[in-house]
Each structure stands twice: as C-alpha cells, then as structure tokens.
C-alpha cells in the first residue's frame, strides 16, 4: 500500500495493481502529501512514514557524498608555500582554500590536486619521521649526542612540524645562535690539521670546497637548536678558552636582565652573522653568495611573470572590474588582484596568478548549476491541507516530521485547516506557507478553571494553583469508572480576559472558560451511565447530570501495630513488644471510634514497694450512647485489649497502643487520618467511615442523611476523601456561625461564637460492625441530638468538664447558609480554647444517599433570573489554571462541592497547544513552541485575541503568523510551475532508470540467445 495516499484513492480497488506503482511514485518520488481528512493515527503514520523515508533517502545521499570526500579520491591537499613573504600571500591563500572547499567533485576532476599527491607526500613524511624518531629514541641509550653530532642534527630536524611554512628551510627563526655547528660540538680540535684552515682559524668552510659560501649552511646546522637546553662548556671543553665567542651574547643578555625574547634572538642572530662575515677571508666569496641568491629570486620572478602573461593573453589587465555570474560587480578582476596600481604584478603574491583558474572552477556554469539547483528543489515536500484536524498528538507528529526535510516543505491550505491541521500548516518552511483566499483556519482557545477551585490529590484537597508535577491527582477512567492517583503531565497557568461559564446547584459549583470540557451525561435516563466530555458553552440552559462518585478498586489492607521498647523493673532492662497484626474490621471500628472521641494520657505514679515513679500509658475512649458502648466492648474484646470502664470512659493501659495513637492526639482542631487509610479497600473505607459516624455527635436531618461535625478543616477534607473511596460522594459547605452549641459529652449546651464542619452521611450506605449483623445500629433513632436553647449554660460553667480532644458540638439552628464568596481559614492551634472557638470555622460535609446513582441534576431555565441554581456567563479578567494528565478527567471542587471534570488534553483537539502557547514565548522545549516559533507573535497579543475558538480568514491567518502569503492566482501559477519542474525532473530521472534497466535486460537476453 502506498505511503501517504488519501483514502479516496483506496476506492480504486485492487483489480488494478499496476496503478499502485504509479501512485507510489506520485506520492513518494514527487513528494506530494495530501492531508484531506480527519487526522487519525492511520493517516498520520502514513504521512510521517513518507516524510521519514524522504529524510532517510536525502540523508543517505549526503553521507555518500561526504564519504567520497573523506576518502580523498576527489580531495586535494593543502599547498605548502615555497617562497615569498608578501602581504597578500595570506589573503590569497585563504581565498583559494575557501574556493577549493566549495568546489564540487566534478570540478575537482580537472584540478591539480586530483591525485592527492600532497596528502600522500605528507603521509610518507609523517611515517618516516615517526619510524626514524622511534629508532633514535631506542638507540639514544647507547650513544651520546655529543659524540654523534649528525644524529643530534637528525633528531632536531625530525622533531620539526612539517605543516609549518618554514619546515623545509632547514633552519628556525627562533635560533639563538648562528655560529657554525662544528665549532660548538666536540667534533675535534679547531686546529685539526685535517680541517681546512683560514688565516684567522675561523673559516673552516673555504672556497676550495666549491660551495660558494652558502649563506644558509650555519643555520641548517643549527636548526631548532635551543641554547638554554645545553651546556656548551660541558659538550666541548675546548670552547672554554674562546671566551670572545660568548661575550657577544652575555653582555646583551645581562642588559636585559638575563631574559631572552624574540627581539633579543633577532639581535643576536644579526650580531652573529656580522661577526661571521667579518671573519671571512675574502669579500669576493660573500659577493658571489649574495649575487647567487639575487639571481635565483630574479629568475623566479621572470618565470612567474611570463607564465601569468601567457595565461592572460586577452585583456591581461582588466582593471575595470569583474562581473560575476549573477551580474553583480565584485571589484577588481582576479587577474588584477595581485597587481599594483600601475598594472605590474605583485610578485610577493606567488599564488595570485592562479586566482583566475580558481574562479573558473567555482563559478556556476550552465548545465551543472541548473542541475544542482533542480536537484535541490526536487527535495522539497509539498503538503496540501484540507482537514478539520484530529488528534493533537498526530498533529504534533506531522509538524515534527516536516522539520526533518532539509530542503524544506511548502504547505498549502485549500479549504479548512482546523485544530491539529493548523499545526501542519504552521509546520511548513517559513516563507512558503500558503492559504487560499477562501480558506479558514481554526485554532482553539485555552480552557481552564479559576484559582478558587481545589483538586483532590494524595496530599488532600489543594488549590489548583498549587498543584505541581510531583503531586498525584485523582483521575477517572471513563471506561471502567475507576479512580486512581497519577502525576499530571503538565500544569497550566495563564492570564485570561473574557466570558466565563458559571454553574451553581445544590451539588455543583464550577467557574470555567466557555470551551472547558465538562464531564456530564446529557440524557434524561438515570440508568444511563455514559458520561462524555462536552464544552461548557454547549450545555448552557440544558439539563445535564454531573458525576461525582467513583469506584475505588483496592485490595484489602492489613494494618501492623509497630513494636515498642519498654523499660521494665528497677533493673532498667529494656524489653520490646513485637509488632502485631490486628483483625482489620475490629481495628478499623476501634480506630474510627477513638479518632472521633478518644485521647491518650501518660501518668507517673509512685510504687508502694520502692517509692519509685512508674509511667502508666493510657488510651481513653469516651462514649455516652449505650448502643455504641456495646460495639466498643465487642471490638476491644476481639482485639484482645484489656480495658476498664468508668462511667462514659473506656481506659486501655497499653504502651504499644499508646505509642502509636499519641501522635494523633493534638487537639480537636488538628485531627487527621493517617496515610495507611488511603490504602484501604472500598469495603474497609465504609467500615471506617461508619465508625467515625458512630463515635462523633451525629445530627439526623432526615432518614437518609447524617451530619458529622468537626472543628478540624484537614479532618473534614479527609472525611470527604474517605467518602469518595467508600463509593459515595460528599460536599463541604461553610455555614453561618451559631450562637448556641450543644456538647454531647457533658450533655449541656454551651455558648460559643464559632462555626463547625458538618458531615452529612447516608446511613443506608453503611452498616455498623457487630458480631451479629441483625443488631446493626439504627443511627437515626439513637444518635439524634437536639438543642434546647432555653436550658443552655455558659461555657465558663462547664469548661472544666470539656475534654480538649473530645469536644464535639452541634448547633440549635439547622438552617444552612452557604457562603460562596469566602474561603475557610486554616486553624493551626493545638488546643480548643475560647479564642480558638471564636476564630474557627464551621463547615458541613454532605454525603448523598445512593452511591451508585449519585449524579446531581442541573436544571437551568435561561429565561429565569440568574440565581444560585442557574448557569450564566460572567465577564472575568485574571489568571486561570488547568492540568493535563492521563484519562483526561480529574476531581475538582469549588466551595466544597466536588465533581469530575475534564482536563486540558483530549484526543481530537489541540486546546492544550494553545494553553502552552500563551507562554509562547518562553521558548521552552515543549510542543507548544510549534505555534510560538511559527507565528512570531508576542504573548500579550495572543492573550488578548484567544478568548474564543479562533476561526481565521486567510488574511487573519497571515496576520497571526500561521501562514505567510495568500495563494492568489499568480501564486498558484508559480506553485504549479514549480511542481511541474519537479515532476518533470523526477519523470526524466525515472525514465533514465527504466531505460538503463531495459538496456541491461536486453543485453542479458541477447547473451542468452547467443
């Protein structure tokens, strides 16, 4: 099946298999991509497969070309300059190297460096140099360089860097001495009768040797010889008597503080040369040597001049300027680049004569340049777009795949480029993105919630603005209805200005952007459990059901009571109590009763025997209701704890149990549930929640719901989360501060200026723990507490009877006043004092009756004035927040009313792209950079404009940077001509390939016939 073929072509059927080859060549070889349908996984994979194949093909050709160049077959080596020190020499060399690097391998076929002679020569030099140096290093241990001066000279020469320009001059510019090498080494006496003598004994190289006083001989002998590395007096003791040889050096060095530098070396070299010339026998020899050097230089100049003039026989001095192939003047011609103003050649630039040839090699020439241009254009990919979008992930994939194409891509939107398809349009090469005049481009606005929403995490309910990537957020699986805690993939925050959708009912309170996806059921059938993500604006004024329950699929958890070390007897011996695994149902019942109305205490008592103090660790559980007391006694017996009942208190003296429960005894305002509670199964959560209701004061509002009160905000949030794990729902509400409260422990009313958290629970959803289920407690008949305001007493009269951790209050006025405009303030104090009661807050948690069908209906009449039960659009300006996470649904609450809602990532929309594109321009390594890098739009303009789903005309698309030009008739004609040239090129190339195959086949057939 061809790659990147639209589905409409699939309808051609399989009875024409030959057509598939032509379609493949049309798509792959001609590099045409059609995006003309919903961008699903199948089409995305086909298109990206095409683009990756194109990239790999281009890349393989590039690697082949680089491999050819690296092999040295068509690559020339660097030229070593063999003379001349002109000022233009370096510039000419760099220009020549630059041009040589830009030459194609076809041009190099006619170049001097085709055979790579310089590379081979250099390689041989390095090889011989390395071999010889290894031999010298090995044999140096058997001889002394002072005895073998020629070996020393050889070692010095081999240590030179042959890449330097002076490598072949056999002397170094940094030499400190220029005296004859034989006078400095122990090669015999200076008065050796076998040595030719001069009148002053200094000239050992006489004219009789017929070398015409080669002026470089002393420097060759002293090549790379550093004076500071050797002690000449030790090398040749005979030099000790010749102090005049060193006076020329020592005096000058001492004047400069004994330091050598380049200027000093130059001075010493000149002095040594002058001293050597003064001691020569005859000026005639010196004259001959100078004349010889001058003649050689003049001869070279004449030779270069003749060669240059022969090459430029026509218009040899084109001083008017040179016009390149593009028609632009580039100043003096390469022919006159090495000339003076009078037209004479600058012979110090020995490579100026070769500039014309280099220019000839690199200038674009006819068919070769046209073919290269055509090959480069043929690598471009043409993407034709007419799509309503699709998966944002697939849109990102197509966009990124277009970036692989080195030659670039041309994108053309014909009808619609919506949502994720706009990513493909923006992914084209900037400057080559076109839209037709009637085309529409659609991008999504950001979708999020305001900062007064809280999100359920493993840390409890936290503001959405405080959620981080490290938090585990409650998410819902839409297929199974199961909830889990997972890390969000992204957290979003950006400024928003525009209309917001607000809905308020008895169980729902949300304030979101109009395109935020609500997780609702739009049918009237209560048995229909199919919930979908629908934009908030589309449900305005309609009857929908929100989902606020979930399935908590966990296995039963086994709690382990930790071991404890105990100091026993007067011997101060330490004994440890091993950890125990209590029976879970009994433990959950006990823990719920104790956390509701229990506390711990430690008492030091003196023993009668030795009058020493003994610590007694007590766990106390307080309860006044007899039915609940029966459950407490059954639970303690099953757990194996010894207890003593004294009135309303059950006392358990057990250090191991006390050690575990004592950290939770921090006062009523600081209650919380431990972490192991969130590992319980759904059934275990029901048992714990039921025991909490048994232990605390419960006010029965009707036969279906129970109200649980607590002064701890954290504990109220934990109860709400526990209710969700148990399979039901909860709603936390703020109530007005009551004036008369009732203490069920002391059985008397108290007057405090405070509010409480109230939990209203459906009693039919749970059963009390009992050995006989038939004796399940009827909470509505036994736990109802009513307030008689007439018999109220003051708090001062009963404060001594109130336990700090078991103070549970109800109020005489059951009317709830929901306060949506204020948030609960956290109370961090440990003890429940009068001041704390005055400053604390009262909240109510509502738990619905039927956990299986706990949907909340929102019936809205848009014609009625907006009230707390209506939905409406409200203008808003400020920050908004959202999450992108797995399963696309997370648990959120506002003003204590929790529901499941959609997040900012869903298959089929590119909304999350625009959420991050509000941060454009932070240039993060994020997918959202797609739009920011393609549009070049500043952040404040994006924020101002993206307040709706953005349907852009062709002009607006260009204005906002998603495209570069309107594809008018003229532009379309240019695109057609461009594609026609590319198609013709590929047709010609394909035809040549077929002809070569035919010729090969015909030749094989002829041979077989013969």
From Swiss-Prot:
Alphabetical keyword list: Autocatalytic cleavage, Chloroplast, Hydrolase, Plastid, Protease, Protein splicing, Serine protease
Could you confirm whether the keyword Protease appears in this record? yes
The name on file for this protein is ATP-dependent Clp protease proteolytic subunit
**Where are the residues of the annotated region Disordered?**
73-100, 182-209
Q: Which organism is it from?
A: Chlamydomonas moewusii (Chlamydomonas eugametos)
Q: Where is this region: Insertion IS1?
A: 60-377
Please provide, alphabetically and separated by semicolons, the GO molecular function terms listed in this UniProt record. Answer: ATP-dependent peptidase activity; ATPase binding; endonuclease activity; serine-type endopeptidase activity
Q: What are the EC numbers?
A: 3.4.21.92
Protein family per UniProt:
Belongs to the peptidase S14 family.
Q: Which GO terms describe its cellular component?
A: chloroplast stroma; endopeptidase Clp complex
Enzymatic reactions: Hydrolysis of proteins to small peptides in the presence of ATP and magnesium. alpha-casein is the usual test substrate. In the absence of ATP, only oligopeptides shorter than five residues are hydrolyzed (such as succinyl-Leu-Tyr-|-NHMec, and Leu-Tyr-Leu-|-Tyr-Trp, in which cleavage of the -Tyr-|-Leu- and -Tyr-|-Trp bonds also occurs)
Show where the DOD-type homing endonuclease domain sits.
590-728
Compartment list: Plastid, Chloroplast stroma
**Domain remark from Swiss-Prot or TrEMBL:** This gene contains two large insertion sequences (IS1 and Ceu clpP intein) that divide the clpP gene into three sequence domains. Each insertion sequence forms a continuous open reading frame with its upstream and downstream sequence domains.
The protein's matches in Pfam families, at most eight in alphabetical order, are given as: CLP_protease (PF00574)
User: What biological function has been recorded for the protein in this entry?
Assistant: Cleaves peptides in various proteins in a process that requires ATP hydrolysis. Has a chymotrypsin-like activity. Plays a major role in the degradation of misfolded proteins.
- Example GO biological process term? intein-mediated protein splicing
Compositionally biased tracts (Low complexity): 90-100
> Among its keywords, does the record have NAD?
no
């Amino acid at each position: 099946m061809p790659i990147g073929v639209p589905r409409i072509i699939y309808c051609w059927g399989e009875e024409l298999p030959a057509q598939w080859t032509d379609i493949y060549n049309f798509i792959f070889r001609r590099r045409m991509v059609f995006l003309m349908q919903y961008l699903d996984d199948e089409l995305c994979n086909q298109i990206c497969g095409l683009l990756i194949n194109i990239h790999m093909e281009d890349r393989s050709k590039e690697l082949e070309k680089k491999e050819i160049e690296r092999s040295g077959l068509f690559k020339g080596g660097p030229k070593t300059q063999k003379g001349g020190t002109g000022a233009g020499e370096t510039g000419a060399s760099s220009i020549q190297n630059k041009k040589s690097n830009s030459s194609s391998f076809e041009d190099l076929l006619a170049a001097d460096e085709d055979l790579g002679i310089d590379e081979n020569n250099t390689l041989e030099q390095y090889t011989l140099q390395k071999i010889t140096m290894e031999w010298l290093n090995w044999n140096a241990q058997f001889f002394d360089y002072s005895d073998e001066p020629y070996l020393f000279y050889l070692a010095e020469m081999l240590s030179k860097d042959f890449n330097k320009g002076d490598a072949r001059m056999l002397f170094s510019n940094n030499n400190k001495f220029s005296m004859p090498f034989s006078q400095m080494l122990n090669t015999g006496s200076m008065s050796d009768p076998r040595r030719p003598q001069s009148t002053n004994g200094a000239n050992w190289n006489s004219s009789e040797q017929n070398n015409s006083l080669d002026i470089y001989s002393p420097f060759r002998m002293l090549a790379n010889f550093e004076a500071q590395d050797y002690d000449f007096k030790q090398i040749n003791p005979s030099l000790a008597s010749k102090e005049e040889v060193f006076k020329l050096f020592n005096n000058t060095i001492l004047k400069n503080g004994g330091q050598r530098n380049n200027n000093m070396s130059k001075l010493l070299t000149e002095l040594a040369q002058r001293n050597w010339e003064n001691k020569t026998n005859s000026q005639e020899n010196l004259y001959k040597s100078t004349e010889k050097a001058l003649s050689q230089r003049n001869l070279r100049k004449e030779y270069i001049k003749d060669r240059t003039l022969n090459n430029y026989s026509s218009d040899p001095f084109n001083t008017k300027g040179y016009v390149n192939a593009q028609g632009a003047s580039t100043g003096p011609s390469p022919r006159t680049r090495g000339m003076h103003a009078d037209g004479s050649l600058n012979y110090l630039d020995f490579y100026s004569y070769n500039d014309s040839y280099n220019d000839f090699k690199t200038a674009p020439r006819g068919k070769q340049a046209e073919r290269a241009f055509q090959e480069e254009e043929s690598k471009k990919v043409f993407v034709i777009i007419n799509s309503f979008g699709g998966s944002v992930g697939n849109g990102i994939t197509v966009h990124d795949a277009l970036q692989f194409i080195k030659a670039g891509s041309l994108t053309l939107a014909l009808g619609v480029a919506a949502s994720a398809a706009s990513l493909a349009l923006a992914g084209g090469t900037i400057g080559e993105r076109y839209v037709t005049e009637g085309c529409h481009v659609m991008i999504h606005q950001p979708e999020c919630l305001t900062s007064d929403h809280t999100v359920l995490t493993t840390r409890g309910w936290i503001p959405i603005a405080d959620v981080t990537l490290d938090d585990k957020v409650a998410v819902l699986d839409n297929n199974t209805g199961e909830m889990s805690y997972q890390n969000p993939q992204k957290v979003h925050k950006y400024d928003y200005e525009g209309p917001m959708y607000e809905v308020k009912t008895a169980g729902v309170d949300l304030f979101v952007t109009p395109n935020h996806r609500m997780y609702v059921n739009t049918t009237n059938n209560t048995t229909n459990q199919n919930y979908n993500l629908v934009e908030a604006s589309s449900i305005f004024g309609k009857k929908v059901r929100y989902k606020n329950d979930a399935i908590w699929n966990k296995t039963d958890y086994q709690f382990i009571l930790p071991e404890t070390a105990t100091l026993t007897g007067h011997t101060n011996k330490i004994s440890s109590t091993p950890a125990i695994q209590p029976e879970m149902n009994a433990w959950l019942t006990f823990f719920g009763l104790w956390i509701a109305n229990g506390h711990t205490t430690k008492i030091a008592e003196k023993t009668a025997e030795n009058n020493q103090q003994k610590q007694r660790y007590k766990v106390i559980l307080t309860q006044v209701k007899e039915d609940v007391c029966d459950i407490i006694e059954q639970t303690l017996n099953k757990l194996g704890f010894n207890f003593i009942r004294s009135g309303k208190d059950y006392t358990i003296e057990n250090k191991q149990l006390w050690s575990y429960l004592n950290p939770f005894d921090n006062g009523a305002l600081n209650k919380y549930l431990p972490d192991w509670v969130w590992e319980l199964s759904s059934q275990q959560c029901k048992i714990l929640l039921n025991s909490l209701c048994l232990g605390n004061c419960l006010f029965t509002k009707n036969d279906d719901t129970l109200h649980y009160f607590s002064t701890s905000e954290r504990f109220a949030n934990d109860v709400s989360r526990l209710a969700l794990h148990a399979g039901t729902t909860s709603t936390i509400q703020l109530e007005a501060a009551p004036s008369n409260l009732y203490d069920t422990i002391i059985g008397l009313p108290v007057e405090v200026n405070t509010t409480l958290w109230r939990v209203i629970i459906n009693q039919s959803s749970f059963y009390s723990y009992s050995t006989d289920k038939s004796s399940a407690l009827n909470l509505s008949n036994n736990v109802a507490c009513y307030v008689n305001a007439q018999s109220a007493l003051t708090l001062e009269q009963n404060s001594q009877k109130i336990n700090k951790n078991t103070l549970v209050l109800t109020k005489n006025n059951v009317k709830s006043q929901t306060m949506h405009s204020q948030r609960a303030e956290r109370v961090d104090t440990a003890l429940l004092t009068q001041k704390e009661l005055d400053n604390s807050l009262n909240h109510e948690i509502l738990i619905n009756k039927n956990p299986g069908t706990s949907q909340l209906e929102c019936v809205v009449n848009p014609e009625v004035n907006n009230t707390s039960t209506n939905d409406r659009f409200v203008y808003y300006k400020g920050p908004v927040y959202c999450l992108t996470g797995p399963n696309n649904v997370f648990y959120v609450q506002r003003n204590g009313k929790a529901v499941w809602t959609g997040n900012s990532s869903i298959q089929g929309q590119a909304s999350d792209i625009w959420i991050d594109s509000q941060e454009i321009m932070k240039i993060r390594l994020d997918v959202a950079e797609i739009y920011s890098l393609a549009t070049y739009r500043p952040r404040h303009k994006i924020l101002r404009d993206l307040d709706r789903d953005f349907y852009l005309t062709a002009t607006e698309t260009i204005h906002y940077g998603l495209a570069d030009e309107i594809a008018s008739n003229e532009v379309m004609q240019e695109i057609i001509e461009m594609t026609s040239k590319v198609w013709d090129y590929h047709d010609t190339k394909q035809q040549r390939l077929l002809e070569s195959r035919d010729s090969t086949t015909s030749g094989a057939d002829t041979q077989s016939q013969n």
